[in-house]
């Protein structure tokens, strides 16, 4: 069954999601896009991307449509989710990627408009469930879970790492630092922002800031509630990030044992295709366009006094996340 999807918000994640489903060849039809920009701009930004390059498809537009390789997509421009006629358009699932309507009370307006499910491409509030693919998708209940969060890109990276460590060795506690590419929530030049550090020029500074990714891991691995915390360091690259996780384990381990656990998880089981494993000396640009949620860098594993372990996972914070959003769409759509 082809899954009929509407996208609300055609920004970085909305467009990356569109490209990812084309590349995956997923059985998903984009029926409509709702975005406040004009169709000429929407089509142009889909066709040309600074990071991913030119879309390998023919793109054209009219006043209220865009056409990609002969497939015409309706373009709407509604500010209020309640005004979008998803039901009339036959949309099954809405991708809520504006970054604005992350509360359940707002997101479920899409359901009132006729959609069956809403997938929020961000951490959410009061959502029915947060799902990190490869970690807790088995907890999904189609009868009761309608507003679903795909968590954050960083949670999608750190949760698989925490899952492997906790299942194999047991986590007592841990701290995380995400070395994160700058995003549209920062300023290109110094300009007011409620976070005074994010008010500073993104391409000229290393910017310490907050992240809820470590704590949010407990939403998908509840046994880790209260055990993890962390911060973010925003750095001057447009994409390509890394999660540095330091934990105290319940038992003593060696570097080889830790790496072997990650190698096994990457090769087999729920994390195959989601967690990658590398022994190469890579840098951030090497994972641009990488579909993994996390590429585990085995050469950087450190063990101190047996129980203190430091590991690092790379992730393309846009592309990897968007690929998981496609996976989640297929997962939920196949159970409609």
UniProtKB/Swiss-Prot annotation:
Key words, A-Z: Cytoplasm, Glycolysis, NAD, Nucleotide-binding, Oxidoreductase
Cited InterPro entries: GlycerAld/Erythrose_P_DH (IPR020831), GlycerAld_3-P_DH_cat (IPR020829), GlycerAld_3-P_DH_NAD(P)-bd (IPR020828), Glyceraldehyde-3-P_DH_1 (IPR006424), NAD(P)-bd_dom_sf (IPR036291)
Biological-process GO terms, alphabetical: glucose metabolic process; glycolytic process
Root EC class: oxidoreductase
Disulfide bonds: none
Complex and partners: Homotetramer.
Family: Belongs to the glyceraldehyde-3-phosphate dehydrogenase family.
Function of the protein: Catalyzes the oxidative phosphorylation of glyceraldehyde 3-phosphate (G3P) to 1,3-bisphosphoglycerate (BPG) using the cofactor NAD. The first reaction step involves the formation of a hemiacetal intermediate between G3P and a cysteine residue, and this hemiacetal intermediate is then oxidized to a thioester, with concomitant reduction of NAD to NADH. The reduced NADH is then exchanged with the second NAD, and the thioester is attacked by a nucleophilic inorganic phosphate to produce BPG.
Protein name: Glyceraldehyde-3-phosphate dehydrogenase
Biological source species: Streptomyces coelicolor (strain ATCC BAA-471 / A3(2) / M145)
